[in-house]
């Protein structure tokens, strides 16, 4: 894991097209902004895990025709 230190208003780059900017810090919360192409999904981890578990619970259609 790469660990970086950024101040409010500073940005980091992921590849050529994704930026992550620190928008604010209040107590133990950090507000960040993510700029990414529309074809790149960006989710909070808990939402991503929910999406993955819902995908896993979907059973494929049976082959009966």
UniProtKB/Swiss-Prot annotation:
PANTHER family recorded: CARBON STORAGE REGULATOR
Record keywords: Activator, Cytoplasm, Repressor, RNA-binding, Translation regulation
Main location: cytoplasm
Key word Cell wall biogenesis/degradation present: no
Top-level taxon in the UniProt lineage: Bacteria
Function summary: A key translational regulator that binds mRNA to regulate translation initiation and/or mRNA stability. Mediates global changes in gene expression, shifting from rapid growth to stress survival by linking envelope stress, the stringent response and the catabolite repression systems. Usually binds in the 5'-UTR; binding at or near the Shine-Dalgarno sequence prevents ribosome-binding, repressing translation, binding elsewhere in the 5'-UTR can activate translation and/or stabilize the mRNA. Its function is antagonized by small RNA(s).
Compartment(s): Cytoplasm
Quaternary assembly: Homodimer; the beta-strands of each monomer intercalate to form a hydrophobic core, while the alpha-helices form wings that extend away from the core.
GO biological process: mRNA catabolic process; negative regulation of translational initiation; positive regulation of translational initiation; regulation of carbohydrate metabolic process
Gene that encodes it: csrA
Record InterPro entries: CsrA, CsrA_sf
Family: Belongs to the CsrA/RsmA family.
Protein name in the entry: Translational regulator CsrA
One of the record's GO cellular component terms: cytosol
